[in-house]
Amino acid sequence: SALTNAFEFDEWALIEEAVTGREIEVAVLGNENPRASVPGEIVPSHEFYDYEDKYIGDGAQLLVPAPLSESEVAEVQQLALKIYRTLRSDGMARVDFFYEKGGRGFLCNEINTIPGFTPISMYPKLWQASGLSYSQLLDELIELAIARHTKRRNKT
């Protein structure tokens, strides 16, 4: 039924497996030597984490840091860094995972190369919990941008 509906709008449709699991996010910061924040968890108040959960009222609970074991924290941080490096990312990104404790573990959902930066956004909250204040985060992002620009300028 959903596939039939999709084909009413286009001749192509992307089909993905539904994944049930916890939503875990890791902030990554850096150019050549990136580092990962403590992970956070989004606990939606509804079945899906939608626009209303994200932006209206108390739609979701943000757990920072996420309630994970030390080994789970290390694993998801290493996965976030591997994804960040594999995609040759610079500056910042937030890597989002589903955590299926029943067998498959951490599954990458997406990478956000321009993560939210509002007072309710996870990215600055993760760095705050990792010991980096909002102003320090901004300073570091500016330094990373200057370093990237200088490196590119010197290549030509």
Enumerate the predicted regions with their spans:
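ATP-grasp fold ATP-binding core
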Residues: 10-20, 24
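Mobile, glycine-enriched helix-loop/loop "lid" segments at the mouths of ligand-binding/catalytic clefts
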Residues: 34-58
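Cysteine/selenocysteine-centered motifs that mediate thiol-based redox chemistry or coordinate metal-sulfur cofactors
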Residues: 137-156
